[in-house]
């Protein structure tokens, strides 16, 4: 919005041209989302407490989690508001990629909101029925996937980028839609599974978003894209603004979500953030890079799949409890130790992922 306004004002005063600089807008996008999140935090927490919208804790979970009962949840609303407002202010709104991410963010946020509402307000422990949750996730993902395919059909925007191989970039055709669907829905649910400890999901989300901000900048720059042997995608650079907004909103939320948490993001936050990261990865043609940088989310998801599969096939569990962060809790690790070690692993994976861009 401000980009459009600055274009007109620059005719009167050239100083307004600063709003056209991507680096400037990326920084202020981060700061705007951070300030909004920090400002909303105390008000959101107080409002949720008045409405008695508190976290539901399973009886079969770790005993250390029983003290979390009643902690305000659905705090992901403030993350989404901060991101959306910041992006609307600082991004070029004529860019279709920006709207694709915002659609997933808002749509998955709505699905998560209904799920949280049923759990904590209507006291329905199951929340939104799984098949309906999956149905709406699928509808949103397919709408966005077909939109993205129609925009970039038969261009580098629909090629498959394989790490370590600079000349392997096949055109996917309609397989692009299937891959996009799988990545968006899968990442959404992976982040949701990871969100089980104070600050555990939000910091890896921040790290991955920061990594994708750098990738988006390179992908949208013809010279750097050529240097790194990745596809040059014309609309990609504006995703930098989306990524930095996620970073700012995430850091602001962490202020209140760090151990011991004053508020949880709930499904409204985790489903939306995961869906947004998946969408960004697809738009940048970096699905494999997401697997590396988002390795914490991948491992958390695999631990659940392996646990369920092992129990059904052999009647035995592999882990003491899944997702795997609970396994380490039950082994006696204090919660802060689990959280910080997962953060360290996440940061390492993001750096490794970025390094693979040059190893081709």
From Swiss-Prot:
What would be an example GO MF term here? phospho-N-acetylmuramoyl-pentapeptide-transferase activity
UniProt main location, coarse: membrane
Q: Which cofactor does it need?
A: Mg(2+)
**Where do transmembrane segments lie in this chain?**
27-47, 73-93, 94-114, 132-152, 168-188, 199-219, 236-256, 263-283, 288-308, 338-358
Q: What is its EC number?
A: 2.7.8.13
The annotated pathway is: Cell wall biogenesis; peptidoglycan biosynthesis
Name the InterPro entries for this protein: Glycosyl_transferase_4 (IPR000715), PNAcMuramoyl-5peptid_Trfase (IPR003524), PNAcMuramoyl-5peptid_Trfase_CS (IPR018480)
Does the entry feature the keyword Cell inner membrane, yes or no?
A: yes
What Pfam families does the record point to? Glycos_transf_4, MraY_sig1
What is catalyzed by this enzyme? Answer: UDP-N-acetyl-alpha-D-muramoyl-L-alanyl-gamma-D-glutamyl-meso-2,6-diaminopimeloyl-D-alanyl-D-alanine + di-trans,octa-cis-undecaprenyl phosphate = di-trans,octa-cis-undecaprenyl diphospho-N-acetyl-alpha-D-muramoyl-L-alanyl-D-glutamyl-meso-2,6-diaminopimeloyl-D-alanyl-D-alanine + UMP
Record's GO cellular component terms: plasma membrane
The UniProt keyword set, sorted, is: Cell cycle, Cell division, Cell inner membrane, Cell membrane, Cell shape, Cell wall biogenesis/degradation, Magnesium, Membrane, Metal-binding, Peptidoglycan synthesis, Transferase, Transmembrane, Transmembrane helix
| Bilayer topology annotation | Multi-pass membrane protein
- Which biological process annotations from GO are given for this protein? cell division; cell wall organization; peptidoglycan biosynthetic process; regulation of cell shape
Cellular compartment(s): Cell inner membrane
Write down the top EC class of this protein.
transferase
Stated role: Catalyzes the initial step of the lipid cycle reactions in the biosynthesis of the cell wall peptidoglycan: transfers peptidoglycan precursor phospho-MurNAc-pentapeptide from UDP-MurNAc-pentapeptide onto the lipid carrier undecaprenyl phosphate, yielding undecaprenyl-pyrophosphoryl-MurNAc-pentapeptide, known as lipid I.
Family assignment from sequence similarity: Belongs to the glycosyltransferase 4 family. MraY subfamily.
Q: Which PANTHER family match?
A: PHOSPHO-N-ACETYLMURAMOYL-PENTAPEPTIDE-TRANSFERASE, PHOSPHO-N-ACETYLMURAMOYL-PENTAPEPTIDE-TRANSFERASE HOMOLOG
Protein name (database record)? Phospho-N-acetylmuramoyl-pentapeptide-transferase
Its organism's taxonomic lineage begins at: Bacteria, Pseudomonadati, Pseudomonadota, Gammaproteobacteria, Enterobacterales
**What gene is it encoded by?**
mraY
């Amino acid at each position: 919005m401000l980009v459009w306004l600055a274009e007109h004002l620059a005719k009167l005063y050239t100083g307004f041209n600063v709003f056209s600089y991507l680096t400037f807008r990326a920084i202020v996008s981060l700061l705007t989302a951070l300030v909004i999140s920090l400002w909303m935090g105390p008000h959101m927490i107080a409002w949720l407490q008045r409405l008695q919208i508190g976290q539901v804790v399973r009886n079969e979970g770790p005993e250390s989690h029983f003290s979390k009962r009643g902690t305000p949840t659905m705090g992901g609303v403030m993350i989404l508001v901060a991101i959306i407002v910041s992006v609307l202010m600082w991004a070029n709104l004529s860019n279709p990629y920006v709207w694709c991410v915002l659609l997933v963010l808002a749509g998955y946020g709505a699905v998560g909101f209904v799920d949280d509402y049923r759990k904590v307000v209507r006291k329905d422990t199951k929340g939104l029925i799984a098949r309906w949750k999956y149905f709406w996730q699928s509808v949103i993902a397919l709408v966005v996937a077909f939109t993205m395919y129609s925009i970039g059909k038969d261009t580098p925007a629909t090629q498959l980028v394989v790490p370590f191989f600079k000349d392997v970039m096949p055109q996917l055709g309609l397989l692009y839609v299937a891959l996009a669907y799988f990545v968006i829905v899968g990442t959404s649910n992976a982040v949701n599974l990871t969100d089980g400890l104070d600050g555990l999901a939000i910091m890896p989300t921040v790290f991955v978003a920061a990594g994708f901000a750098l990738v988006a900048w390179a992908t949208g720059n013809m010279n750097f894209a050529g240097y790194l042997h990745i596809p040059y995608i014309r609309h990609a650079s504006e995703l930098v603004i989306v990524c930095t907004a996620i970073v700012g909103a995430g850091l602001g939320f962490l202020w209140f979500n760090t151990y011991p948490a004053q508020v949880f993001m709930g499904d409204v936050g985790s489903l939306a953030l995961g869906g947004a990261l998946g969408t960004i990865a697809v738009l940048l043609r970096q699905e494999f890079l997401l697997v590396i940088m988002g390795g914490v989310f991948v491992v958390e998801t695999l631990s659940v799949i392996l646990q369920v599969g092992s129990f059904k096939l052999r009647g035995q569990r592999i882990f003491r409890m899944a997702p795997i962060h609970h396994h380490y809790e039950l082994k006696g690790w204090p919660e802060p130790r689990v959280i910080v070690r997962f953060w360290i692993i996440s940061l390492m994976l993001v750096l490794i992922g970025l390094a693979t861009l040059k190893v081709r």
